[in-house]
């Protein structure tokens, strides 16, 4: 079950391509809206990164923790998860139009999109496209969001499409302030992500 939830977390993490920011944000909190807009614009230019960290899963019938490696190069991604004590591993690679999921001792699965793969393999429908934004400390641009800014005009929390994301700490890397520890609360699923190493890149188009 833990591996299944890890796969879910991985699939939520994927969106290939970028979209522009609209006026779908409801802002509150202590931050300055102008500073937030500048911060958001800077982070939106990031189209590549490498993350090493830990992920924790809490669900009604299962919980556990594992390690996370996430390589993003524009619209290509390579995400690897390893369960506790080496109990299972999963790797998801792809770009728009083709996704491959490899699960240790189980097999290799393909689909045209991460959303399709999630539904085919797990029977679940979840907002697959959002975490690539959330992990940078940004709301996904394609739906309404409620944002709370901290005193530094960065996200303290956001509510979007039935999920709540709390930003507990940030780290500065190469001039970017990026989330270091965040918690995601969804229906019957809580995810904690701790980033041990952020390597952001602006690759260009």
Swiss-Prot record:
It is a lipid-anchor. A lipid is attached at residue 18 (N-palmitoyl cysteine). Gene3D superfamilies: Lipoprotein localisation LolA/LolB/LppX. Pfam families: LolB (PF03550). It comes from the Bacteria. One of its GO terms (cellular component) is cell outer membrane. Its main location: membrane. The gene is lolB. The lineage of its organism: Bacteria, Pseudomonadati, Pseudomonadota, Gammaproteobacteria, Pseudomonadales. PROSITE patterns: PROKAR_LIPOPROTEIN. A lipid is attached at residue 18 (S-diacylglycerol cysteine). The keyword Membrane applies. This is Outer-membrane lipoprotein LolB. Monomer. Belongs to the LolB family. Keywords: Cell outer membrane, Chaperone, Lipoprotein, Membrane, Palmitate, Protein transport, Signal, Transport. It is found in: Cell outer membrane.
